[in-house]
């Protein structure tokens, strides 16, 4: 029984485990494994915490992005409203300005017509006075009648103007 190889292998194995037990290797091995398990658990907890923090940051940035997009849309809408209002005001101002210029042009035309009519009347009066003077001068004596003619012509000129 002691001469077989299996016996000595078994004896060596038992002795090996006895030596390991004597030096408390199993406790050291268990402590190392427990420490390793605790480290892994701590890393998992840290990973969960970081993941939750990342999700919170992501949600925060998504919320900020939505708010920024809404604000940009509001700004664009406000700009459109202001542009439409400015266009309305500009059209109204242009219409008023066109009306003023049209009125001014019409007034200038009316004034020019009046001036032209007055000029024509004055010229006609001067021509009539000159013609009357020549006709009367040819028919009247040079004496008293000339004074009468001059007086009449002066009155006629003042009445026509």
Curated annotation (Swiss-Prot):
Its main location: membrane. It is found in: Cell inner membrane. One of its GO terms (molecular function) is proton-transporting ATPase activity, rotational mechanism. Pfam families: ATP-synt_B. The keyword tRNA-binding does not apply. GO terms for cellular component: plasma membrane; proton-transporting ATP synthase complex. The chain crosses the membrane at residues 1-21. Keywords: ATP synthesis, Cell inner membrane, Cell membrane, CF(0), Hydrogen ion transport, Ion transport, Membrane, Transmembrane, Transmembrane helix, Transport. Signal peptide: none annotated. InterPro entries: ATP_synth_b/b'su_bac/chlpt (IPR002146), ATP_synthase_B_chain (IPR050059). It is a single-pass membrane protein. Belongs to the ATPase B chain family. F(1)F(0) ATP synthase produces ATP from ADP in the presence of a proton or sodium gradient. F-type ATPases consist of two structural domains, F(1) containing the extramembraneous catalytic core and F(0) containing the membrane proton channel, linked together by a central stalk and a peripheral stalk. During catalysis, ATP synthesis in the catalytic domain of F(1) is coupled via a rotary mechanism of the central stalk subunits to proton translocation. Component of the F(0) channel, it forms part of the peripheral stalk, linking F(1) to F(0). F-type ATPases have 2 components, F(1) - the catalytic core - and F(0) - the membrane proton channel. F(1) has five subunits: alpha(3), beta(3), gamma(1), delta(1), epsilon(1). F(0) has three main subunits: a(1), b(2) and c(10-14). The alpha and beta chains form an alternating ring which encloses part of the gamma chain. F(1) is attached to F(0) by a central stalk formed by the gamma and epsilon chains, while a peripheral stalk is formed by the delta and b chains. This is ATP synthase subunit b 1. The gene is atpF1.
């Amino acid at each position: 029984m002691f001469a077989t190889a299996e016996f000595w292998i078994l004896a060596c194995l038992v002795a090996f485990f006895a030596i390991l037990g004597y030096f408390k290797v199993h406790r050291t091995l268990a402590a190392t494994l427990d420490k390793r398990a605790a480290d892994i658990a701590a890393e998992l907890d840290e990973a969960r915490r970081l993941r939750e923090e990342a999700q919170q940051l992501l949600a925060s940035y998504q919320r900020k992005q939505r708010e920024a997009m809404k604000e940009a849309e509001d700004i664009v809408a406000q700009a459109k409203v202001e542009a439409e209002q400015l266009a309305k005001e500009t059209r109204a101002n242009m219409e008023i300005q066109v009306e003023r210029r049209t009125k001014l042009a019409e007034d200038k035309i009316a004034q020019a017509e009046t001036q032209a009519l007055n000029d024509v009347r004055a010229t006609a009066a001067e021509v009539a006075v000159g013609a009357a003077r020549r006709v009367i001068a040819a028919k009247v004596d040079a004496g008293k009648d000339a004074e009468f003619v001059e007086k009449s012509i002066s009155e006629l000129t003042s009445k026509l103007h």
